[in-house]
From Swiss-Prot:
GO term, biological process aspect, one: DNA-templated transcription
General function of this protein: DNA-dependent RNA polymerase catalyzes the transcription of DNA into RNA using the four ribonucleoside triphosphates as substrates.
Subunit structure: The RNAP catalytic core consists of 2 alpha, 1 beta, 1 beta' and 1 omega subunit. When a sigma factor is associated with the core the holoenzyme is formed, which can initiate transcription.
GO cellular component, one term: DNA-directed RNA polymerase complex
Name listed for the protein in its UniProt record: DNA-directed RNA polymerase subunit beta
Source lineage: Bacteria, Thermotogati, Thermotogota, Thermotogae, Thermotogales
Family: Belongs to the RNA polymerase beta chain family.
Statement: the UniProt record of this protein carries the keyword Nuclease: no
InterPro entries associated with the record: DNA-dir_RNA_pol_bsu_ext_1_sf (IPR042107), DNA-dir_RNA_pol_bsu_external_1 (IPR019462), DNA-dir_RNA_pol_su2 (IPR015712), DNA-dir_RNAP_su2_dom (IPR007120), DNA-dir_RNAP_su2_hyb_sf (IPR037033), RNA_pol_bsu_bac (IPR010243), RNA_pol_bsu_CS (IPR007121), RNA_pol_bsu_protrusion (IPR007644)
GO molecular function annotations of the record: DNA binding; DNA-directed RNA polymerase activity; ribonucleoside binding
Amino acid sequence: MKEIKRGKRTRYSFERVQTPIPVPNLVEIQTKSYQDFLENGILKVLKKFSPITSSKSDLRKEKGFSLEFVSVRIGEPQNTVQECKERLLTYTVPVYTTVRITDNSTNEMIEEEAFLGYIPYMTPRTTFIINGAERVVVNQLVRSPGIYFVEEAKKTSGTKPIYVAHFLPVRGAWLEILLNLNDEVFYARIDRKRRINLFLLLKALGYSEDLELLSLFPYWIDVEDEYTLQHSEGLIILEDVKTKNGGLIAKRGDVITQGLIEKLENSDIQKIKVAHRYAVNTLEKLNHVYGENIEENRAYIEIFRKLRPGELPRINAAKIFLRNLYFNEERFELSEVGRFKMNNRLEEAYRKYLIEVEGKDPQGVEEVKYDETSNVLTPMDIVLASRNLIEIDKHPGTMDTKDHLGNKRVRTVGELIRIEFERAFSKAVFMIQEKLATYTSLDKISVQSLINVKSIIATINSFFATNPLSQFMDQTNPLAELTHKRRLTAVGPGGLKRERARFEVRDVHHSHYGRMCPIETPEGANIGLITSLSVYSSIDKFGFLITPYVKVVKGKVTNEIVYLTADEEENYKIAPSTIPIDEKGNIIPENVTVRYEEKVLYVNKNNVQFIDVAPNQIVSVSTSLIPFLEHDDANRALMGSNMQRQGVPLIETEAPRVGTGMEWEAAKYSGTLILAKHDGIVKKVDAQKIVIHRIDENGKEMYDSMGNPMLDIYELLKFTRTNQDTCINQRPIVNVGEIVKKDEPIADGPATDMGELALGKNVLVAFVPWEGYNFEDAILISEELLEKETYTSIHIEVYETTARDTRLGPEEITPDIPNVSKEKLRNLDEDGIIRIGAYVQETDILVGKVTPKSESDTTPEEKIIRSVFGEKGKEVKDTSLRVPHGIEGRVIAVHVFDKEKDGDLGPGVNKLIRVYVAIRKPLEVGDKLAGRHGNKGVVSKILPKEDMPFLPDGTPIQVVLSPLGVPSRMNVGQILETSLGWLAMLTNRWFATPVFDGAKEGDILPELYKARKKFGLEMGDFEENPSGKVILRDGRTGKEFDHPILVGYMYVMKLIHIARDKIHARSTGPYSLIHQQPLGGKAQFGGQRFGEMEVWALEAYGAAHTLNEMLTVKSDDIRGRNEVYKAIMKGKNIPEPGLPESFKVLVRELRGIALDVRVYDDEGNEIDIEKL
């Protein structure tokens, strides 16, 4: 065990593996990507459309103007992050571009800077603030452009496979080359529509001679192999066949006949070069349909006929049509990534082509690369893909797997926004061309008026506001925030559809190792589609996920770190990081287990090429926070990972006694801590700010050139609301005079303790059934947890109201509210706004507001008062902002925005008032608690501490869990955590047990026994074979329980599923306008739905009157419910129900589709249902 420093705390770590590299910056994927967009992406898009020339309808009837973009400049944000949040603004920066306009007739030019618009800017916490709300742009995992060799799904069983070479561009039509083994013919499918003969396409691309086509698919026949020779009848010879004496047996282009076979058998010839049967069949089929030796132009016309059957084929139109599909950069784009993938995939096929078709020396082409650079398809691409299909037929194992990570790439923030920016700008280009054409001379051109800023900004803003990849940030706690920024999603625009995603797409694949976490994923419909990046994973320049490995040479681990993509990794044998290594870096065992391709092999240590960098390389940040993960079932680990993100920040934070060593990294990169920017000495500390005087390497205080001290001032966030209504409150953890190092934590945020993540509390637990109160995952807790406020959390709700202009005059914010007692107004100030610090309960007034009443609402008496007192007697309606049901708390802030001071607040709004109420939520029955191993439960009873079971020294247990929650769930990690937690508490130490490299049972139990013996707690355990169990006594009777019980300290979190937020009751409330039925849900103060199945239940009981009531007066019989209310108030019998509104709605809907529906009574008289 060794000591390690984590944040401001020292932990004792059980790690055995020395990790050669530190944990990388966990949010770098976001920052780097967006920075690249600002620095290079915008300019690249502008350059792509440069130069823009004026359109043909030029006023000057001569050479027009051309416009090009020279450079881009990014300005400074206008508002701070905090201002944007408070005033519901978007945090943006202005973008300027330098534009050069040239007069093409005189070559004169002007250069001017133009404003491109405001673009949302990433905050230091890698989020965006859009209309006051923090949002995150999630990384999208999409199929990489390139070429894929796959098998087409069979339509009928018993048929042979169809192999497909699928060209997938970033933009443009698809092209698929098919090899149909049923008729042994090559086809090309163009743009997912029509299938044509492949040779027809190749003829159009310049391979006009039949023999030239066939020679692309050569094949050598061994004449001595009688079986092959006999089956070669019908094939076409590609080279003259001569005997050793020079005698000609067959010419190039001859068809092999039975007679020729006999001649060959009797000759001294060993090999002949023929065309592959598939090529011969394809040519025969082509000639059968179109006649022999069709030339290039005819091929174009036939393709055009096939694709556009109704149109008259003209050669020029046909050529342009095909060129536009695959060979025009404006219509078809492979992209740099697509070309890179395609060159790599076709490299082997290209070498074979050089040897077989061009006759190159095999030795000379071993190192040759296929280095095509075109951004569109080339005829060679199509030829190589077709040839490779024959190889696929021989070796079906070389087909591509769609789910391999080598075939998927990540679209990060920068790229997603660049795509939107490009889309917006491509529309603006036409406008620029049109406007340029209207100018007659250079000096009259106004650069700013050429560029339409509005359309560009509108597109980018709509991306942030509406695109499914721009998400409202999960800010429940720092881990939720960090995980959200590291999320990968396969759904969204250009991705998969949730309903159509196959099981294979969602499953764990061997290529995910070290790149994508196999554990952290949601449990619902998105399982496997939304995942998380692994701890050490990052992205290469093409967007492929890479992970680091340490190079191993001849059984010795070097210091060289190599990052590999999923494709590159397939070629190497990689050992796990936990294999034993001596001090010099030599692998100790002779044979080790390695990963190779998708297999696990047992090889000699000299064959190992790489070794993992860390044991937690495979998992995400959330999962690597679970101690003893190696002892948990994967399904429960998944729940543990997900539930840590739901932990509520508590009033008093406490880091886990049993951690994994990742708590510091998770907190550091979450952005909730304040880290020192430079080395320095703390000069001042209070609740609001920390002042640090910088020091140099020698520890001397630094001063600027004017002799002023160089101070870093850190402002602390106090009681700020998050997106999920939890509370951000930063607290200093340094003292005056303390020396701090750069990147050292100086203030804790929510759910952090001494710089480490602290989502829950270390509580004393016992695994024992207790009177059925912990049946089925229920949890019994001690009142002690309430007394100490262990699980009390602060939540901040915001309530908002506006004073608007109405038709009858403006609304008014005032304390002068009609028919409200002085008692209710006691906390309002002279403007009618609640004072800060007031304690409020449901229905209390937060902001007094009155709205003018319409004339129709006034009674005759009020009209007389109006005529006497004039405007003062004008009647107003009370529309004050009140505290909703079920809420009580303290007002901590009030923000008032005025139209005159703060600018536009929206149409017709004169004043906007926002009131923040802090609500204290202690632990209650019904709240959800969870450990880190997927062990969750609901509080069933809060017992007085004197009734709780207690230890031999009298310490009462704090939480009683059911022992039956462990065996079937197979999350034994919680047992080991409990025992190690007890050892940590008894010895007052903090432990780190990293995942896959943590403490073993033998490390914990003997040490725990020694510590217990020291404190006299060894009852129920034995030194020879310690179990960690103890004899407990029942708090009510004082008697011992029958058997020793497992006791210890477990880290338990309170989750955001809080009972008091969900509990809800309604007597009378709002109704739906159309159906006149009560609304649903707590937010609408709705009722309980009495659904179809509940109706069946009443029908089954024969409870006719109850059923009648449910379907009428308690639901949507408007007249009936009013009559019932009156009858109850007057103590009369309940009247007969009327007609439900839903029946009227049905009749109206039938009339809406032109059906004449009438209703008659028993005597046949027509009834007007609207009057009922």
